[in-house]
Amino acid sequence: MNPTRGAVGGTDPRPAAVVLLSGGLDSATVLAIANQQGFACHALSFRYGQRHEVELAAARRVASALGVVRHVVVDIDLGVFGGSALTDPTIAVPAAGTAEEIPVTYVPARNTIFLSFGLALAETAGAWDVFIGASSVDYSGYPDCRPEYLAAYQAMANLATKATVSGERTLSVHAPLMHLSKADTIRLGLSLGVDYGLTHSCYDPGPDGRPCGRCDSCSLRERGFTEVGVPDPAGG
Amino acid sequence: MNPTRGAVGGTDPRPAAVVLLSGGLDSATVLAIANQQGFACHALSFRYGQRHEVELAAARRVASALGVVRHVVVDIDLGVFGGSALTDPTIAVPAAGTAEEIPVTYVPARNTIFLSFGLALAETAGAWDVFIGASSVDYSGYPDCRPEYLAAYQAMANLATKATVSGERTLSVHAPLMHLSKADTIRLGLSLGVDYGLTHSCYDPGPDGRPCGRCDSCSLRERGFTEVGVPDPAGG
């Protein structure tokens, strides 16, 4: 409705925050939360060689619908390292529940890389708050979604930048979904007016961008909407 | 001389290490140290919108001369954030000693971003050791070159990846130059056979790639060679 509420370095009186925005259900909810908390949000998305680039179109729709100060898309090539079904076309995306403990959809150091760009953006935007949609409930078992990881990241970040070492303020990494089930996340997002029809969760969409309905991410999403008792407006 | 000592996933019996290689004097020395310690080195360089892209040519020369298992160059666009004289053509590179406490050549979260890609490469290469040329002596005052920062990074990294959370082993971030002056670094590198004529340090080279002779990096390099009492083979 109001995609640009303020200009970079402009007169927006709200404190700036960086929100990692994938275009999925979780990060859309996090953006709504940060907005509701009164932050002027700088959304940050990545084109990282993922199979599901349809995510980025969803991120743009979500950023526009919920309102952000700006939306930065950074190109990074995680594919050069290989090792993940999300970036390596030779590795198949498994069906939900069939994977090993940490599944092949895990991308090495992904959240660490994403948060590090978030840290850079926070410094240049004058933001002291970085939001990420990590959750340790109903998640895929990725190590970089756990609270102890994020606490260690925040400790490191506060030693890392010109802004944080000034001692003036400390940077906070917020994961407001950390202890919410997928259903709780959906309930919260609906209460904040998130249109989940704009979001995309599937790891392995068809050529038309439609969700596969069988990967971990589709499965978690479907279970969430079923538990809430509302249909998934994205038709997942 | 022997640019490819082993193949990825091949029969190289040496443990793998990741070495961040900028093409400068420090990282060339670090690569020589890691080689001498018996590691099979995976060199990692970045094309990050820096003014001094001649660095990358130097990184390729150094990797080839000292010998690496492979040399990965990752494209990342730090320029989208602005805020540094190294990536923003509208900010002048200052002469040495004229800058504020943390100079405008500081790139927001640069080492955090570089190490995070290093962490990803370490995981896919099966490496437990990441080397970086950071030093807290004769340096430009960047917060992400200090030992407390690197210790916090290592703590975070050990919670971040599938490999590190297995509990099998811990990942180490090595900064073997941390407590060395530039002159000590040069002495060590010379004793290991580093050809500093292949390296490039200047933040603001001319169109022909020649060092400016006046930036912080040129100045530190010149003082180092003067202290050692040998000419800079790069003619800096």
UniProtKB/Swiss-Prot annotation, chains A, B:
Catalytic activity: 7-carboxy-7-deazaguanine + NH4(+) + ATP = 7-cyano-7-deazaguanine + ADP + phosphate + H2O + H(+)
Pfam families documented for this protein: QueC
Name used for this protein in its record: 7-cyano-7-deazaguanine synthase
Biological function: Catalyzes the ATP-dependent conversion of 7-carboxy-7-deazaguanine (CDG) to 7-cyano-7-deazaguanine (preQ(0)).
Pathway: Purine metabolism; 7-cyano-7-deazaguanine biosynthesis
SUPFAM superfamilies tied to this protein: Adenine nucleotide alpha hydrolases-like
UniProt-listed Enzyme Commission number(s): 6.3.4.20
InterPro entries: QueC, Rossmann-like_a/b/a_fold
CDD domains: QueC-like
Co-factor: note: Binds 1 zinc ion per subunit.
UniProt-annotated binding residues for ATP: 21-31
Family classification: Belongs to the QueC family.
Binding locations of Zn(2+): 202, 212, 215, 218
Record-level GO BP terms: queuosine biosynthetic process
A Gene Ontology molecular function term of the record: zinc ion binding
Cofactor(s) for this UniProt protein: Zn(2+)
This protein's UniProt keywords: ATP-binding, Ligase, Metal-binding, Nucleotide-binding, Queuosine biosynthesis, Zinc
